C-alpha cells in the first residue's frame, strides 16, 4: 500500500520546533501567486495516493531568505506546487523547489526528499513594484 512519508501530527511539529536546532530564525521577502489550471493537468503530476482538488490551482512562491545561522545566509528560494487532497484533507504537492545554494538544496533534498534544484532566484521590491524570477539551465520563468 502506498503511504506518504514525512506526514506529522500538529503535536509532532510543535515538539520538533521546540527541541530541534534545525528550527532557527529566518526573514523572508516573498511574492506568492495562485492561478487556476486546466482540469486534468494536476492528475498527471501528482502521485498516488494523492487526489486532485475540485478547484485545480498552481501555487508559486519566489523569495529572498535570510537565515540567522552560522553568521547568516542570504539566498533565493522558490516553490512551484499544485493543490491536492489526501484522505479528505487539502494540501500542496511541490513539483519543484529551485534554490540558489548547494547547501540549501542538499539539506532539504537529502534529508526530506524535497524536489530541490539549483537555480538563480531573484525577488525584489521597489515601492509598489515587485519582480521575481527563477532561471535554471538558461531558461527564465
Locations of regions flagged by a protein language model:
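Short, surface-exposed linear patches
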Residues: 53-58, 81-84, 103-106, 117-119
